[in-house]
Each structure stands twice: as C-alpha cells, then as structure tokens.
C-alpha cells in the first residue's frame, strides 16, 4: 500500500511518500498453545510459530506474559508483539542453549560466527531473541522483551564465566536488513542490543530500561556494523547508553571490519555511564558516524573514547560529527581514555609492557 503524509508548519510543507510491504501470512502464536501465566515455559511453542512462519509472514503474539528462553528468528519474517505482550526471560541459565563463538568449515578457511563476548568470538548463552545469519527481519509492536535478569543470578559476579558467558537481550550476528521498532526491552542479562557484522540495521522509536545498578547492561552496542540508524530511542541504563565497537585485536586484525556509516538521531540517553562511547573493543576502527539532536541527561560522561595499547594499527577513529547535542547534568562532557583496561585481559603483558607486543 502506498501512503503520502504532509506536515505544514510556519508556512512550510513537507511531504513524505512511502510504501508498506505485503504480508503473505498472519500467524497467531496463540494457536500454538501458548500459556500466558508468566510461569509456564513457552519456548517450544513460540519457536514453533517462528519456525513455521512462511516467507513474508508475521508472527503475532497477543497480550499476556509468556515465559521463554532463547528464540531464533528466520529470514523474511516479522515478529509483532501486541501491546501488553511480554516475553519474559527464563531465570534458569541451564535452559538456554550455548552458542559456540565460531564454527570452522571443512575447508579450514571459512568461518561461521555465531556469537561473541566483549570483542572476542567466545561461547555465550543465546540471547532472548536471536537474529543470526539471516536477512529481512522485523521485530515490532508495543510489547515488551523483559529478560527478568533481576530475578535470576545473571547480575551476580558478572565478570565470572559460569557455563558460558552471559546472553544479550537481542543478539544479532552476520545479518542484513534488520529492523527493531516500537517495543520496550528491559532488565537485560548483559548488553541489551548487540549486533555483530550486521548491515543495514534500523533501531527505531523504542525503549531500553535497565536498572542503574545492573552490571554491564549497555543499551546498544553495534560491533563492526555498516549502515546503522539509531533514531528516536529512549535509553535508561546502568552502563554505556550507546557504545560503538569493532572487536578486540584477534578479530579486528583478522577481519579488519570497522563500524561505519552510523546515524544516531533524536535519542534520549539517560543516567548511563557514557552517552555515546567509542570502544574500548574497537580494533577494526570506527568511521563515519553522525550524531544529531540527542539529549544526554545525567550520564556520567557525554562523548567518551576508550582504547589502549594492543588494539592494532586498524583501530582508527575517523569522521565523527556531533551536531545539536544537549547535555544536562553530565559530569564529564568529553573524555578520552588511552589506557583503558577494566576488562580482565587489560592486564595482559602486551597491554602493560610495550616490549611484550
């Protein structure tokens, strides 16, 4: 269907024309036997709806609280969460599948990446929603992804690996044409939205809510992504609101994939440690980012760059533009840390000693 919208103000008229995509099938997930009591495990039923949805179809989740562990979306489908629909994360980590960081191929050359942890391809629990090696995927509606991490042990000793590294609320890997729109994501296990090697990613008009004391619960952390738009997102977290990343030295030097062509516009960045952050995992480089019309409200820092010795000669930051950005109650508007080493491998010999590189 074609639409035209016109807005008039102060004698000026702006017109926007757009077309909505055709929907081949409407899949009501409640027909798969969902139990909306917030306790019953609905993982298999929800996954059945997602897996059987035809190309171009929409999986519709009605209002209700649905307990689930990891769900995997497939290409050319839409997940629609109705207002009042809550996907509630399972609190038992043994119910989540473990994804290997990388799978080797038979030719011993090609590699298939599935997940990562703080810039390295390390085995991690699958996220609540997983968008992995797919294309043309939409998650939309006015519903909620609630990881419910505060009622599990996800925030206890967060730097300690237990079985595998912690999951993300929404994990994306090596995918293309992905859109998140309208939903609320809250109480994440660790980083909330973590796309790795994603091209043409739209994160539009949604909310991220994590408690201020929740450890390592960054809002949005694009890693080695291209053509990302983050527009109209309200982020309330206890760590960095938006952190641009490009892997640590192993992947950064091997793949040389920078994070580039990023637009961040009309976002509220509230209470986090950093408003817009570069790094510290940025061995592939961060390039061509434009930030406009954003409000940083009582973040500890405004624009922060984090890097350190050993990131490699591809760790170049270039083409950053900040325009019409307001900061309120920000303790340190601009910070550059050239020797950042909060994570465990920050104490490695090559970081501490130039001769060890």
Protein language model annotation of sequence segments:
Residues 1-357:
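Extracellular/periplasmic carbohydrate-active domains that bind, remodel
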């Amino acid at each position: 269907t074609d639409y035209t919208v016109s807005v008039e103000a102060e004698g000026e008229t702006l017109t926007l024309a757009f077309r909505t995509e055709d929907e081949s099938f409407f899949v009501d997930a409640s027909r798969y036997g969902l139990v909306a009591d917030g306790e019953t495990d609905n993982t298999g039923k929800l996954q059945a709806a997602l897996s059987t949805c035809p190309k171009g179809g929409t999986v519709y989740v009605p209002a209700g609280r649905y307990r689930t562990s990891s769900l995997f979306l497939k290409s050319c489908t839409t997940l629609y969460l109705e207002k009042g629909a809550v996907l509630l994360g399972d609190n038992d980590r043994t119910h989540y599948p473990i994804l290997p960081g990388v799978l080797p191929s038979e030719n011993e050359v090609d590699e298939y990446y599935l997940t990562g942890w703080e810039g390295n391809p390390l085995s991690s629990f699958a996220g609540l929603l997983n968008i992995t090696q797919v294309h043309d995927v939409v998650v939309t509606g006015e519903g909620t992804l609630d990881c419910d991490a505060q009622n599990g042990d996800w925030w206890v000793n967060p730097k300690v690996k237990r079985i595998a590294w912690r999951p993300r609320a929404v994990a994306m890997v090596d995918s293309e044409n992905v859109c998140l729109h309208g939903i609320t994501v809250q109480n994440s296990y660790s980083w909330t939205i973590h796309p790795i090697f994603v091209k043409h990613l739209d994160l539009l008009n949604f909310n991220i809510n994590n408690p201020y004391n929740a450890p390592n619960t960054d809002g949005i952390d694009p890693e080695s992504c291209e053509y990302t738009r983050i527009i109209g997102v309200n982020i309330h977290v206890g760590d960095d609101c938006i952190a641009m990343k490009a892997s640590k030295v192993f992947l950064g030097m091997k793949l040389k994939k920078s994070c580039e062509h990023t637009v961040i516009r009309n976002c509220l960045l509230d209470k986090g440690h950093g408003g817009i952050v570069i790094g510290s995992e940025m061995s592939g480089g961060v390039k061509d980012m434009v930030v406009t019309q954003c409000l940083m409200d009582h973040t500890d820092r405004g624009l922060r760059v984090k890097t350190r010795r050993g990131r490699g000669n591809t760790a170049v930051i270039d083409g950053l533009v900040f325009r019409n950005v307001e900061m309120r109650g920000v303790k340190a508007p601009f910070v550059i840390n050239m020797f950042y080493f909060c994570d465990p491998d920050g104490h490695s010999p090559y970081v501490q000693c130039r001769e060890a590189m």
